[in-house]
């Protein structure tokens, strides 16, 4: 890795990060998700419907939200790909609409990105009491505040280095052949 890449990695901020949320009839949970992100980060909601009232309401309530209606239910993979095509930032945080970020989760992922040379994907640990997948995979002897490698990440929350991934896959990061589950 070169000095230029190192400087680039160090430059991730809330300003060059977009959040992408794919929604389908998620009106009852998506507001908690958006509220947990913060108002200074651009959020792109891909609503897998043609619900213009939802679009109008969410964009009025949240000035940092852009809602794109897909007109039909594309599924998670195609919805996330549509979101990625509609952001003009170097990094994207993919979130499911029922995710509520705790405390400084975004800032912690940004900090972790600075510790990992040339990362492609970073994911937070979900509530270890509810979802012990990473702990079981890694074992019990790890520091949960330090980044560590895993075989895979869950798609509910993933920080993507778009600049790096675009070189690899030219915008189709998610397999659109899978409508829901296993698309990531």
Predicted regions and their residues:
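A conserved acidic beta->alpha catalytic loop
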Residues: 36, 47-55
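Short beta-strand/loop segment that forms part of the nucleotide-sugar
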Residues: 41-50, 68-70
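Glycine-rich, basic loop-to-helix element that forms the pyrophosphate-binding segment
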Residues: 70-87
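Donor nucleotide-sugar recognition loop
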Residues: 169-184
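Conserved donor NDP-sugar-binding/catalytic core segment of glycosyltransferases
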Residues: 104-134
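Short aromatic/hydrophobic "clamp" motif used to bind/position activated sugar donors
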Residues: 92
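Short, flexible, basic/aromatic active-site loop/helix in glycosyltransferases
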Residues: 132-157
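Short, well-formed alpha-helical segments that are part of the catalytic scaffolds
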Residues: 21-39
């Amino acid at each position: 890795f070169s000095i230029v890449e190192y400087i680039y990695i160090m430059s991730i901020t809330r300003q060059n990060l977009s959040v992408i949320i794919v929604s389908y009839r998620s009106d009852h949970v998506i507001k908690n998700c958006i509220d947990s992100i913060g108002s200074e980060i651009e959020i792109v909601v891909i609503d897998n419907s043609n619900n213009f009232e939802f679009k109008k309401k969410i964009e009025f309530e949240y000035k940092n939200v852009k809602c794109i209606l897909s007109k039909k239910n594309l599924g998670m993979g195609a919805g996330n790909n549509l979101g990625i095509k509609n952001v003009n930032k170097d990094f994207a945080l993919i979130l499911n609409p029922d995710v509520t970020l705790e405390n400084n989760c975004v800032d912690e992922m940004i900090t972790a990105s600075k510790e990992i040379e040339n990362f492609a994907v970073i994911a937070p640990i979900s509530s270890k009491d509810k979802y012990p997948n990473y702990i079981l995979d890694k074992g019990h002897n790890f520091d949960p505040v330090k980044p560590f490698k895993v075989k895979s990440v869950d798609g509910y929350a993933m920080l993507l280095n778009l600049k790096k991934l675009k070189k690899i896959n030219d915008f189709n990061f998610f397999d659109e052949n899978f409508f829901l589950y296993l698309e990531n």
